[in-house]
C-alpha cells in the first residue's frame, strides 16, 4: 500500500515538479532529469553531454569548492550519482531527512550557477577518459559500438557518447569549456527539466523549499531537438554481422528498427510482443530451442528507445550446437513471429497482462526513495500527469492494429543480425572500442526462406497463466521485530517473522539445505553448481508463468549447500515449492544436458577471469579471506575430469546427511509456515540423517602489510586496500560502517578529482560474514 502523498506543480519558469511526502520516511531523496543526453552532442564534440554531467559536481558560485556537495552528502549518511543516456541526463541523491533542505540548496545550484572552473575542466577530461578506458573491454559496450558502426551516420545514435581525451581536447579556436557553456545555456533549460523530491516533510513545506531554490533556473524555451534521419537508412538492411567478443560468449541478436513507442505507453504494443517472443514456458520459442540443445536463454523487447524511433531486439544465448545452427534458429524466430500473426494477437492476452500488472501496481513493495524520484522525473517527460505513478503498469485500450503495426516491422528485410563468437575471423574494428567485426548483406534467397517461414509443430502461444493469485488477503497486522524460532528438531529449524510493514500480500521463504559435501573440495563445488543450473533449466518452463504472475523462486548454491528462495504473493507458493522439491529428488539429467552444462560452466569460469581489474581484485580478496574457497582455476581443473556419473552420485549422497533451516518473512502466518515446513520435512528429510555443517572460517590477518598480485587481462589496473577490523562485535562493525561513510567523499575527491588516479574509486565497509572490515578501491 502506498502511504505517500503527492503533489504535481509547475514552477514559474516551466519546471515540472513532483513532491512526495511520507511522514514516516527515514530517508529523503531528490532527482532532476534533463530531457537531453548524448544524442544532442555536437558532431564535433562526442561525449560533451556526459562531460557536462561530470563538471556540474565541481563547484558552484555559492559553493565553489570542488567536492563540497559530495562531502556534505557523505557527512549526513547519504549517497549521490548521475548518469547520461541518449535522451536523459539524470542527477540524484539521498540523505538524512533533516538535511534535505541544505542538500537541495547545494543541488539546485548545479542548474543555474555552475563554475566550470578551467582547472577542473582539464582535470575532469582525465576522469571521463578513465571511465571510457574502464569499459574498453566490456563486451556489452563493444557490441553497442559495433552496431553503431553500421547504423546511419546521419543519426546521432551512431556517434560516440562517452567522451575521451581525444574528443574533449581543445582544437584550434574550439575550446571545450566554451562549448560546455554553450551546450549548458541552450539545453539546461527549465522547460526541458523535471524535478522530484521525497521526504517526511509536509507537501506545503517541500513546496516552500523548492520554489526559491529551483525557480532561478532559466527557461530558454529550447525545443526538443529532432534527428531528421532514421537509425538505419532506407535500403541499408538486411545486414549480417559477425562480432568477436573479449569473453567466450555465443550470442545471436536479431535487431529490428521500429517506430517510436514511448507515446504508446498505455497500449504497450512492444511490451505485448516482448511478452510473447520472450516467453519461457511450455511451447515457447525458447523452450523449443532448448529442447533442440541450441539455446541457453532468450530475451525480447525494446533496446535503443528514443522519441523518434526504437530498436526491437531478440537476444539468444547460444550453445555450441546453436552456433552451428544460427540460420535454423533465425528461421524459427520468424516462424514464431508468423504464429503470433496467426494466433497471437488476442484480447485475452492483453487482459491477462493488464490483470497481472494491476496486481503488481496495487501491491508493489516499498521502493527506495531515490529509485522512486528517479523514475518519476523520467516519467514526467512522457506520461500524462494522471499516469505518472501508474504509467509503467498501465494497460489501456487494446489495439490489435497497433500491435500488428509493430509486428509487421519484424521481417527479414528489416533486420540486422549479429552473431557473437570468439573464433570468428573479422576484417573491421569499430573506431572507439576496437570491437572486431565483419559485416555483409544477407542473400535474397536466405531472406526469402525466412520470409516464408511457417509456424512449427510443438510451438504455441502461451496458455492462460494458472499462477495469477486468487487469495491476496492479509494476515493480522502484527509485526515482529526479529524472527522467532517456531520449530526445532535435529535436521530442521524453522524461523518465522511476520512483517506487515508494507501492508501487502507478499512473503519470502528461505530454505537452506546444508550439506557437508559443500565444503569437500572444488569438485563438489562445481558439481553443486552444475546440479543447480540443471534444475533451474528443468524447472523454467513450469516456473516462468509463476514468475510473471509475481510468484518467483531462486535456486542457488551457497557456502554450506543449496538454497531455495520463494518470493512474491503467498498464494500458491507451496504449489511451486512442491514442484521444485519433486524435481530435486527425481531429476537425473542425460548425457546431452550434462555436456551442455559443462560447456556453460567452463565459459562462466573462464569469463570470470576476464572481469575488470577491480572486480577481479575484490573477488580474490573474498576468496583469500574465506576458507575453504576455490578459485576459478581450481574449478576449471576439476571440470576437466568430472563426469556425469559423479554428478548422479553426488545427487544421491546429498540427501544422506543434511541440516535444513527455514525462514518465513512477510505476509505469512505461523500455521502457513509450519505447513511449508512439513512439506519440506516429508519430501526431503524423511530418510536424511542430521549433520551440522560449520560455517566457513574468516582468515584473521597477522599484523603488518601483506601484498597479493592478481592477473587481469585488461588495459587498466586496480588496487584494493583491505583493513581488517578488531572483531565481529556490533560496536566494531558500526565503527567500520561509520568510518567508511566518513572516508568515502574525501577519498573520492582526493584520489579521483584531485590526483586523477582512476575512475572507479570508493572506500566502503566490507564485512566478511560478521567480521568488521573496511576496503578502499582505486
Task: Please state what every model-predicted region is.
Residues 207-223, 676-691:
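Glycine-centered hinge/linker elements that transmit conformational signals in sensory
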Residues 405-416, 422-425:
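Extended, domain-scale alpha-helical bundle/helix-rich regions
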